[in-house]
């Protein structure tokens, strides 16, 4: 495997962080909807 330069590594890291944020937002919305639309934990 070729070694990433620091610039490439930073770019890759940004994509990973963005993907994680998107996933967390979607998960949070899904949990919120599940909480409000079902008797779950009421």
UniProtKB/Swiss-Prot annotation:
Primary location group: membrane
Membrane-spanning intervals of the chain: 15-37
GO BP term, pick one: photosynthesis, light reaction
Entry's Gene Ontology molecular function annotations: bacteriochlorophyll binding; electron transporter, transferring electrons within the cyclic electron transport pathway of photosynthesis activity; metal ion binding
Record localization: Cell inner membrane
Keywords, alphabetical: Antenna complex, Bacteriochlorophyll, Cell inner membrane, Cell membrane, Chlorophyll, Chromophore, Light-harvesting polypeptide, Magnesium, Membrane, Metal-binding, Transmembrane, Transmembrane helix
Topology, Cytoplasmic side: 1-14
Residues annotated as binding a bacteriochlorophyll: 13, 31
Residue intervals on the Periplasmic side: 38-42
Record membrane topology: Single-pass type II membrane protein
GO cellular component: plasma membrane; plasma membrane light-harvesting complex
Domain of life of the organism encoding this protein: Bacteria
Known role: Antenna complexes are light-harvesting systems, which transfer the excitation energy to the reaction centers.
Family as reported in the entry's similarity comment: Belongs to the antenna complex beta subunit family.
The protein's name in its UniProt record: Light-harvesting protein B-800/820 beta chain
Organism from which the protein derives: Rhodoblastus acidophilus (Rhodopseudomonas acidophila)
């Amino acid at each position: 495997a070729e070694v990433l330069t620091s610039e490439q590594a930073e770019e890759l890291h940004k994509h990973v962080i963005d993907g994680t944020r998107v996933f967390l937002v979607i998960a949070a919305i899904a949990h919120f909807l599940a909480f409000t639309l079902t008797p779950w934990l009421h």
